[in-house]
């Protein structure tokens, strides 16, 4: 994906730009917490259109409460994932908070997040998954509340669209991936071994299955119900990431549910809610790949999107500035 921004750059945004993943990141959180046993499939957290912690309010949208993890993924509950993430970091099974966050970091790294994947499209941005050392450098003394926004994919986490697509592939495969690449093998140029080697991710089979159920719930009756199809079962997760200017619109998913053939990630700069732009675009990609054609209504959607160019936000100055960790006041309700 090459930028057509007013900057006139030629960035390969699929691999060279890292975004806040927003609520798409909740699937990675679910696998880690379920696998570690700090969250059970039946654990419920309440949400009254958000929650307040230490005088800070994190918003959410209206949905039934309390929720267990499948329902929380389906409705993209911010309260559930912030609370459960804080409970993981503060869990007594770990000797220290540093041990807990580093264990969490190991899961994220095994999914291909926070590091270069080694794809043949580049240059790659690493993204960021905070470790204990990173948090100590940035915050000094920190608590689970300091980083609670990480639970819902905001704060100090970033990922490239390729990394998010790879995350979808990890889940579709129930726990493994192959390094993404574009070049196919030819008789004279076989595929490099690096692209044929299986990478096994952390996580229990049950954790993957429950997370997949949550992603399916999001499509059947949750935040991306508009892309549900009778012909094939899509599993997905929307995201809306805060940003200067309009929010970014995100979606990750795969299909079919039981014998997946395609994993997709869509990021629309300044596109607004994930359910409004990224998810419908992803559904068109999935439909064309699985069926070899587009329905008439889908063709209409393509024409509609073609006329809906989104102009990325351009700051008033090009002066380079250090990236600063988001502050508590910035975070509002972002779920779709």
Protein language model regions, located:
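Short C-terminal domain-edge/linker segments immediately following a structured domain
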Residues: 91, 182, 266, 284, ...
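Beta-lactam-recognizing serine transpeptidase/beta-lactamase-like catalytic domain environment
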Residues: 1-23, 28-274, 316-336
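Short, highly charged C-terminal tails/helix-capping segments
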Residues: 297-323
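C-terminal, active-site-flanking charged/polar segments
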Residues: 258-260, 272-296
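Short, intrinsically disordered/low-complexity patches at protein termini
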Residues: 63-65, 128-129, 287, 297-302
């Amino acid at each position: 994906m090459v930028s057509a921004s007013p900057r006139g750059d030629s960035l390969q945004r699929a691999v060279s730009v890292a975004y806040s993943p927003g609520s798409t990141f909740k699937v990675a959180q679910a696998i880690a917490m379920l696998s570690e046993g700090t969250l059970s499939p039946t654990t419920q957290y309440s949400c009254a259109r958000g929650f307040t912690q230490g005088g800070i309010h994190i918003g959410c949208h209206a949905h039934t409460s309390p929720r267990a993890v499948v329902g929380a993924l389906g409705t993209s509950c911010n309260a559930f994932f912030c609370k459960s993430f804080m409970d993981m970091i503060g869990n007594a099974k770990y000797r220290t908070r540093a041990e807990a966050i580093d264990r969490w970091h190991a899961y994220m790294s095994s999914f291909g997040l926070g590091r270069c994947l080694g794809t043949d499209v580049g240059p790659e941005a690493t993204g960021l998954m905070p470790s204990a050392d990173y948090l100590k450098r940035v915050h000094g003394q920190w608590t689970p509340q300091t980083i609670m926004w990480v639970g819902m994919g905001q704060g100090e986490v970033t990922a490239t669209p390729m990394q998010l697509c790879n995350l979808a592939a990890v889940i579709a495969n129930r726990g493994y991936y192959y390094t993404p690449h574009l070049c196919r093998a030819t008789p004279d140029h076989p595929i490099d071994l690096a692209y044929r080697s299986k990478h096994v991710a952390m996580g229990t089979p049950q954790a993957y299955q429950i997370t997949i159920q949550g992603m399916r719930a999001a499509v059947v009756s949750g935040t991306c119900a508009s892309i549900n199809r009778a012909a094939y079962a899509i599993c997905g997760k929307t995201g809306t990431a805060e940003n200067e200017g309009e929010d970014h619109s995100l979606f990750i998913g795969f299909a079919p549910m039981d014998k997946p053939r395609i994993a997709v990630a869509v990021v629309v700069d300044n596109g607004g809610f994930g359910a409004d732009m990224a998810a419908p675009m992803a559904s068109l990609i999935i439909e064309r790949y699985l069926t070899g054609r587009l329905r008439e209504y889908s063709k209409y959607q393509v024409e509609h999107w073609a006329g809906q160019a989104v102009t990325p936000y351009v700051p008033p100055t090009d002066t380079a500035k250090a990236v600063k960790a988001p502050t508590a006041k910035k975070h509002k309700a972002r779920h779709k």
